């Protein structure tokens, strides 16, 4: 059983990138559906305000810390995690393991045409990977999309609708897709399609992808301002715990 670490009300699997990918492969050999969630600080805060969303995340089979802020908060709370596991890197590690195994991947989300472009790029990057279908994120009814995924006989679905929409969609429709593993991956399809560039490696290693994105998109300042509040919440919980023990 994988060790879990509670951070501000949400339990994370304390895993490395490789451990997370191996765990996902193991889940694919069990009857599904299994939800993989990739919360960052913004998503944790959202889960604290929305009990229903919080329950869906808590029920996920694999919860990985996508966001350096989650790792910092864990240290503040005295419950250190093994490290950050970016969702985009988790997806890459999972696809590398799927390639050649005959496991089938469906891509759901983004603007029309983006998922198809991502599929073409991934087929080149991961020889042997079977992308069995795509669907954009602009749809009104869930059932036809779930049926499309079922007909494609997908083993894994990357659901890229943004949080909390993607996790709630998986909770409602996961069983109807017939897939074993469904992963909430936010804006990953835009990256796989080459529409959005990841931060340079130096920024990634330093955990400063958020700063790079802020420089590229100043309009994100409102969202980024939530990170200090998240860390303050962690510090407040640590102080409160200290008072209870004193």
Regions found by a protein language model. Name each.
Residues 40-43, 161-166, 188-189:
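Short glycine-rich anion-binding loops that position phosphate/pyrophosphate groups of nucleotides
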Residues 71-148, 152:
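Conserved beta-alpha
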Residues 136-140, 180-216:
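Short, flexible loop segments at boundaries between secondary-structure elements
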